[in-house]
Design a protein with these regions (language model features):
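Histidine-rich, glycine-flanked metal-binding segment
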Residues: 4-24, 31-78
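Conserved small/polar residues in nucleotide/adenosyl-binding loops
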Residues: 114-116
Length: 116
């Protein structure tokens, strides 16, 4: 494992355990659980270095003096979606397709490039 990846994992674990403080905490989230198909209200999300370190009912252990806390007022959050079967043909640039997919919450694409 590269040292930067190891450092990132250690940082995420430290925040999740409350040993290190997060950069950002989102409060009052309605979390869409893709496992149980339910909406989990009042979820809190702690973020460090643009990565999610903690998701749960109470992220106060991750909040420090420099942590920015944003109340998102019961808006919905969900994990990034993966599109596991698609084809891009010669009429669509892959970079443009990726941009449009992100707007729909798709963060992972598994595709077959056809005639590009």
């Amino acid at each position: 494992m590269s040292s930067s990846l190891a450092d990132s994992i250690n940082s995420l674990n430290s925040v999740a355990l409350g040993e290190k403080k997060s950069d950002l905490v989102l409060t009052n989230c309605n979390l869409l659980s893709v496992y149980t198909r339910e909406i989990i209200p009042k979820t809190q999300i702690a973020i460090i270095n643009d990565r999610i370190a903690y998701v749960g009912p109470d992220a106060t252990h991750t909040i420090g003096a420099k942590t920015k806390v944003i109340d998102i007022h019961n808006k919905f959050v969900s994990p990034g979606f993966a599109d596991t079967h698609l084809h891009i043909d010669q009429f669509v640039l892959p970079s443009e397709f990726a941009k449009q997919s992100l707007l729909c919450g798709v963060t992972s694409l598994f595709l077959s490039l056809i005639h590009i």
